[in-house]
């Protein structure tokens, strides 16, 4: 059971790490980017819709004291008949499915971190996880990006049960279950884990070392992201600082964000015509030229901000 908890935790926290690393905070506008209102909650209407659907930008992990719901969110859920996430949360509670996917955490071809790092880098990583009480012997075959996620703060599965940390996906799923709403996912857990296989393990290992070297700044970056989130700065959260950190996750922005956003659009179009649906996806996916809001508008839908400050 504890292994399954860690698996679910790793999936959630790794997606937070991806968004945090790929969408560095910056107030500098990028030429050609659509200007969007600061709002996490949006109404979606369009041809063939009998009722509006809704789009909500989440942050996958947030401190319990910082958790909030913008005005209108509960009303939007009440006016929806289905709730869709990036991943169907039923997958995250299906023990059989989780057990079958746990080997997807590991690198292919029996590769280990030791194969990817210089001796001094390997020692840095070993010492870091040893200080956390996690011998690297048990972790060195795990894909480095998952290990990078584990460096982000002092998160653990237990922090959810104590309320120290919250996940919007988990909280929204509870609401959906209480209302007996249909739930679904725009992707599968297997797909999200497989995304990391498209990033060379050498690049992942390099990012792990750099993340550990700057681990002291991790808490500050989380605080910056949380502040942006509470101010509903979706354009800022989606703005990629491409070129500022050469060799980082910015080089894989299309794999991690843009391509996934494009794949969601036809699914949202089809599902929203069937029934009014509340879509909860990472806020980093909403803004920008290749963000979900702009792509839905290009597909002929009307999106209206509902939660402006």
Segments (PLM) and residue ranges:
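Bacterial N-terminal signal peptides that target proteins for export
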Residues: 1-11
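Generic short amphipathic/hydrophobic targeting helices enriched at N-termini
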Residues: 14-15, 58
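C-terminal motif of bacterial Sec signal peptides marking the signal peptidase cleavage site
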Residues: 18-21
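A cross-kingdom marker for long, charged
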Residues: 250-309
């Amino acid at each position: 059971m504890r292994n399954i908890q860690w698996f679910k935790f790793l999936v959630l926290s790794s997606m937070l790490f991806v968004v945090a690393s790929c969408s560095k905070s910056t107030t500098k506008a990028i030429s050609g980017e659509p200007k969007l209102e600061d709002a996490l909650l949006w109404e979606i209407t369009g041809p063939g819709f009998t009722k509006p659907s809704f789009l909500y930008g989440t942050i996958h992990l947030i401190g319990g004291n910082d958790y909030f719901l913008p005005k209108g969110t509960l009303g939007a859920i009440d006016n929806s008949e289905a709730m869709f996430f990036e991943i169907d949360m039923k997958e995250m509670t299906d023990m059989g499915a989780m057990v079958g996917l746990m080997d997807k955490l590991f690198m292919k071809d029996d590769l280990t971190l030791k194969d990817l790092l210089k001796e001094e880098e390997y020692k840095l990583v070993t010492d870091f996880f040893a200080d956390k009480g996690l011998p690297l012997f048990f972790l060195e075959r795990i894909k480095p990006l998952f290990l990078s996620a584990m460096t982000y703060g002092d998160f653990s599965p237990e922090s959810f049960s104590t309320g120290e940390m919250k996940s919007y996906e988990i909280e929204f799923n509870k609401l959906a279950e209480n209302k007996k709403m249909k739930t679904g996912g725009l992707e599968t857990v297997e797909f999200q884990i497989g995304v990391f296989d498209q990033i060379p393990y050498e690049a992942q290992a390099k990012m792990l070392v750099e993340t550990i070297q700057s681990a002291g700044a991790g808490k500050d970056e989380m605080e910056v992201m949380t502040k942006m989130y509470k101010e509903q700065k979706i354009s800022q959260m989606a703005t990629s600082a491409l070129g500022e950190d050469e060799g980082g996750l910015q080089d894989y922005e299309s794999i991690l964000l843009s391509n996934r956003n494009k794949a969601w659009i036809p699914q949202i179009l089809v599902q929203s015509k069937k029934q009014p649906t509340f879509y909860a996806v990472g806020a980093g996916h909403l803004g920008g030229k290749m963000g979900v809001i702009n792509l839905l508008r290009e597909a002929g839908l009307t999106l209206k901000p509902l939660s402006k400050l």
